[in-house]
Structure formats: structure tokens, C-alpha cells
Amino acid sequence: MAKTDKVKIFFQHVMPKHLISRLIGKFAAARAGWFTQLFIRWFIRQYKIDMSEAIEESPKAYKTFNAFFTRHLKPELRPLEASESELAHPVDGAVSQLGDIENGRIFQAKGHDYSLQELLGGNEEDAKPFVDGKFATIYLAPKDYHRIHMPCDGVLKKMIYVPGDLYSVNPLTAANVPNLFARNERVVAIFDTEVGPMSLVLVGATIVASIGTVWSGTITPPTGGRIQSWSYPTSGHSAIHLKKGEEMGHFKLGSTVVLTFAKDAIEFNDELKPLSVTRMGEVMAEIKESDD
């Protein structure tokens, strides 16, 4: 590892990541007038963001940085291409890793893997349906669209908030910080779907000021020191049904989504591999036919 990379990793270990993230969160939520506008325009230039994709193309339309960062895209630019027998990509981003969950372990990077059970909050019963299943880890860069959508129809079964650290989740950190996605703060959503159980894990990171869902609003902050979970009815008027392509959550500043599926439920698109660019709505996987 290059000396500069070692320095970057060292500073991640020692800097007050939660404090920095919350301070940035306060700024991102503030209506700071000309300063907010200046920062938004700098961000657009720095990360080469194509504002023609946004419903509100003008930076002036956004009164806070958070409003800009969670901007909605024109629906016609992210059509739902996945058919009834396919799963759609949930986000714009890039594949970090994907493949089989082996003996309850998920591959992170060369020399590093982590526990499925830890990722989902430590409950063995929550992890059991996904043992020997499939996973996909997708990294959202600062330039990306930061709303998360459903890869298939689903009914929300459980949500879990897992407190943790706030390391960066960029490729350098993923390659050098063990257990990264199972040690960072995260929100786990477990669904019953047409392909069986599915989890969507929204992983926090340095300067991620907020993680939210469409059914509960902002989950974090505030943060807590203990795991919290909420169970939901899967039938009746109170059940939370979300359709394929429908929004399920968002990040205020970028991070990572980890998806898990049961054994023999899906087969990923052959073209997908680490660093593959993903676009919400495009085909991610095929639903495997049941042997029944």
C-alpha cells in the first residue's frame, strides 16, 4: 500500500468520525443562502454532476445542500427495464463485490470477509434465511443519485438500526479496514418478496449525515448505543407494500447498499462484476425458477 494511502487509513482510525459527520449534517440541513449556493455549485463542478438529469435542473432551486443531494431525477431517465422474471438495480452506483454467501461469510475485498449475522444486527434468526445465498455490495459515490429503490415487489417484515462506526466506505477503505460493512452504523430492512426473503442494508459512512426510509422518515441521527428493531405486519391494512422500482430510502451524503438473497433464489446478470456501473431500474438478476 502506498504511503499516502496508509496515511489516509491512519487518519480514519483516529479522527472523530461521528462528530465530523454530525457537524457536516447540520451544515447540509442549514439554509445558508449564498454560501449554500456556492457550495452546491462547487460540488457540481468537483464531481461533474449532470444536472440535466434532475427534475429541478437549476442549483437555485435547492435551499439546502441536503435538498440538492437527495434531488429527484426525471423518471424517464431511469425507466424500469427489469421484466417480471428479473430484479432491478436498486441504486445508481458501482458494484463493490457480489457473489455467494459462503458459510455465513460475505466477501469484502482481498483478504477480508465479514459475518452475515453481524451485518444484519447479530440475530441468528434474521440471518438464517440468507445462509449460502447471494449478496451484492454497491457503492454510491458523491456524484451518484442517492435514493434507494426496490429491486422487486416486497412487503416490509422488519427494520433494524445497528449503531457503529463511520469509516469511509470507498474502495481504499474496503480493501484495508476489516469487517467494514459490519462495523459501520447501518439500517437493515428485511422484506418478504416474490423471490423469498431479501434484505437491504443501508450502510453509513464518514460525513453521511442521515439515513432515512419512506415508511419511518429519518432513522439516524439521532444515533443510539444499542441495536433497535421494529417488526411490521405483513398482511392487512397496516402492511407496508413496496413495488419494484418504488423508492424505499435515501442517504444524505454517499454510502453503500448491501443486498442479500436466499439460496437458489436469483442469478446475477453475467455482465456484473466488481467496478461495474449500475443504474437504477436496469436488470440486476434473473429470478430462478422453483423446482416445485
From Swiss-Prot:
GO cellular component: plasma membrane
Cofactor field: pyruvate
Annotated catalysed reactions: a 1,2-diacyl-sn-glycero-3-phospho-L-serine + H(+) = a 1,2-diacyl-sn-glycero-3-phosphoethanolamine + CO2
Keywords on record: Cell membrane, Decarboxylase, Lipid biosynthesis, Lipid metabolism, Lyase, Membrane, Phospholipid biosynthesis, Phospholipid metabolism, Pyruvate, Zymogen
Coiled coil: none
UniProt PTM comment: Is synthesized initially as an inactive proenzyme. Formation of the active enzyme involves a self-maturation process in which the active site pyruvoyl group is generated from an internal serine residue via an autocatalytic post-translational modification. Two non-identical subunits are generated from the proenzyme in this reaction, and the pyruvate is formed at the N-terminus of the alpha chain, which is derived from the carboxyl end of the proenzyme.
Places the protein is found: Cell membrane
GO BP of this protein: phosphatidylethanolamine biosynthetic process
Pathway membership, UniProt: Phospholipid metabolism; phosphatidylethanolamine biosynthesis; phosphatidylethanolamine from CDP-diacylglycerol: step 2/2
GO molecular function: phosphatidylserine decarboxylase activity
Cofactor note: Binds 1 pyruvoyl group covalently per subunit.
Pyruvic acid (Ser): residues bearing it: S255
Cited NCBIfam families: PS_decarb (TIGR00163)
Role summary: Catalyzes the formation of phosphatidylethanolamine (PtdEtn) from phosphatidylserine (PtdSer).
Entry protein name: Phosphatidylserine decarboxylase proenzyme
Source organism of this protein record: Idiomarina loihiensis (strain ATCC BAA-735 / DSM 15497 / L2-TR)
